[in-house]
């Protein structure tokens, strides 16, 4: 399909650099979905708490999204002179078109809608920073993405409409701000918790997959995951957070033997129909930011 125009301004970014970041985004999505075993999530072992999607759907979806990530970067570069609050409006048509390709690739299954939002923001932030000759670091990328989202939670969640979206309902009932709140705050769960935790485990020589699984547990224990709350209510969310925290307190995932705990956790999540998709999205960002 035809791609939305980004801007009338030109970008000075090299195509090879843009493609390099887009490739990292694709690899981040594949790394997350292939990671196994993940409680309640689609992985190489099973489909978790999902009956409508499988591993191959995520592979097709990631490939479709990869083709759009350069457009997010280019728009971030071309809009570098705009006020940051104005950037999000220009990103929306790119995100919607990307989402359309995702649904076509998966025959209508929502595999990566959250990642289109979050990776799209980070890619646009990278484009802006590169265009302005500013350092591209996890902190600068997330703070720039946050500047794009200033006021987003207030605009989209604090509403008194009679027909509430799922996100608005969870905000009003439980105070959960979900992906919008995390983005507007500059991804603090990633920057302050998941990313340093993951990098520390790698520095200690832990196997990268075990380190990522342990980091996923950390996110599940701390994230107010709206995916979980929409399926299991506040009780389901608190149960999942408590179980993840208990595993971390017992030592987390440090050896292949510890994977037995995750397999049991996975079975319990499937029985309760709980899937921590929001934490999975944040794990994608964690891996992505660890590479830059």
From Swiss-Prot:
Q: What class of enzyme is it?
A: transferase
Q: Can you state which reaction this protein catalyses? A: 3'-dephospho-CoA + ATP = 2'-(5''-triphospho-alpha-D-ribosyl)-3'-dephospho-CoA + adenine
State a single Pfam family of this protein: CitG
According to the lineage, what is the superkingdom? Bacteria
What Enzyme Commission number(s) appear in the record?
2.4.2.52
Query: GO:BP terms for this protein?
Result: prosthetic group biosynthetic process
Q: Which UniProt keywords apply?
A: ATP-binding, Nucleotide-binding, Transferase
GO MF annotations, alphabetized = ATP binding; triphosphoribosyl-dephospho-CoA synthase activity
Describe the family membership recorded for this protein in Swiss-Prot or TrEMBL: Belongs to the CitG/MdcB family.
The protein in question is named: Probable 2-(5''-triphosphoribosyl)-3'-dephosphocoenzyme-A synthase
């Amino acid at each position: 399909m035809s791609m939305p125009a980004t801007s009338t301004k030109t970008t000075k970014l090299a195509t090879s650099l843009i493609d390099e970041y887009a490739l990292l985004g694709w690899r981040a999505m594949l790394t997350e979905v292939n990671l196994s075993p993940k409680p309640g999530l689609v992985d190489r072992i099973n489909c978790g708490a999902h009956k409508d999607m499988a591993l191959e759907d995520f592979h097709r979806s990631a490939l479709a999204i990869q083709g759009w990530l350069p457009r997010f970067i280019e728009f971030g570069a071309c809009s570098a002179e705009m006020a940051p609050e104005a950037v999000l409006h220009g990103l929306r048509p790119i995100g919607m078109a990307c989402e359309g390709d995702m649904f076509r690739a998966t025959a209508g299954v929502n595999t990566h809608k959250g990642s289109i939002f979050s990776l799209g923001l980070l890619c646009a932030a990278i484009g802006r920073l590169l265009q302005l000759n500013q350092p591209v670091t996890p902190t600068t990328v997330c703070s720039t993405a946050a500047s794009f989202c200033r006021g987003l939670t207030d605009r989209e969640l604090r509403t008194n409409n009679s027909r509430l979206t799922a996100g608005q309902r969870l905000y009003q009932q439980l105070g959960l701000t979900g992906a919008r709140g995390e983005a507007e705050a500059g991804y603090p769960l990633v920057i302050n918790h998941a990313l340093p935790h993951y990098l520390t485990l790698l520095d200690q020589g832990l196997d990268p997959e075990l380190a990522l699984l342990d980091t996923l547990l950390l996110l599940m224990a701390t994230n107010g995951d709206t995916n979980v709350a929409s399926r299991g209510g506040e009780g389901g969310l608190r149960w999942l957070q408590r179980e993840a925290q208990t595993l971390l307190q017992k030592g987390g995932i440090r050896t292949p033997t510890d994977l037995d705990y995750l397999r049991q956790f996975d079975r319990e999540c499937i029985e309760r129909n709980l899937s921590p998709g929001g934490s999975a999205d944040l794990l994608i960002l964690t891996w992505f930011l660890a590479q830059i």
